[in-house]
């Protein structure tokens, strides 16, 4: 075939022709990250329960990205927001494990192994919270340093808090906002959404703040 076609260059893709062609143009991290964003947006559109969720989550979690003020981290947070509801239709006991496995096995070449594990950790905790009795892929224990792992847990717990608080709509997410400084994670809750902030919700917020090594503050406006 090579002799007959007289090709000068042969590109072999490990997953698909599409990925192989795109890989040619992956000249820098920004381009690779952009492709990752596109893939995650496609997954969000195919698996999301309600419109506008990803954008609402990105806006809400933007202040928390300050725990690692780098472009690469902010991009991972955005990707996690896109993927945050990908397993809503699965059995509740299995969602964390399945979400992590889907990221670890996603057939694309636009992520490093560390990025896969980071997103897997974030999505696992988005569904499982801090529970210790849920199934979990062994791969999540590899590659990440202590700080990077803690940051993934924080983002996962923030997504968990937000999606449970949302109660199936994006409107309630517009009624809350986060603030972050060196000592506190603060949550502002508008009067219109205060009925949703029950004791269980308060406990989830405390776990989120403590995962970021900060104290929680709540302002009922």
Model-found features: residue ranges?
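Low-complexity, glycine/alanine/valine/leucine- and proline-rich hydrophobic stretches
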Residues: 168-218
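General small-molecule cofactor/ligand-binding pocket signal
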Residues: 10-13, 215-219
């Amino acid at each position: 075939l090579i002799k007959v076609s007289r090709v000068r260059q042969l590109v072999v893709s490990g997953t698909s022709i599409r990925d192989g062609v795109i890989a040619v143009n992956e000249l820098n991290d920004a381009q690779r990250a952009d492709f990752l964003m596109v893939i995650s947006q496609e997954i969000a559109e195919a698996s999301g329960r309600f419109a506008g969720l990803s954008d609402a989550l990105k806006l809400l979690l933007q202040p928390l990205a300050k725990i690692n003020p780098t472009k690469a981290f902010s991009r991972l947070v955005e990707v996690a927001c896109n993927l945050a509801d990908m397993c809503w239709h699965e059995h509740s006991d299995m969602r964390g494990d399945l979400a992590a496995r889907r990221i670890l096995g996603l057939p694309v070449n636009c992520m490093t192994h560390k990025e896969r594990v980071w997103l897997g950790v974030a999505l696992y905790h988005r569904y499982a919270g801090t529970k210790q009795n849920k199934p979990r892929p062994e791969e999540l224990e590899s590659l990440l340093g202590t700080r990077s792992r803690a940051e993934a847990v924080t983002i996962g717990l923030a997504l968990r808090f937000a999606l449970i608080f949302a109660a199936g709509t994006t409107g309630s997410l517009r009624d809350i906002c986060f603030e972050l400084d060196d000592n506190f994670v603060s949550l502002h809750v508008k009067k219109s959404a205060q009925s949703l902030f029950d004791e269980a919700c308060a406990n989830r917020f405390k776990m989120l703040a403590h995962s970021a090594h900060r104290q929680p503050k709540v302002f009922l406006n």
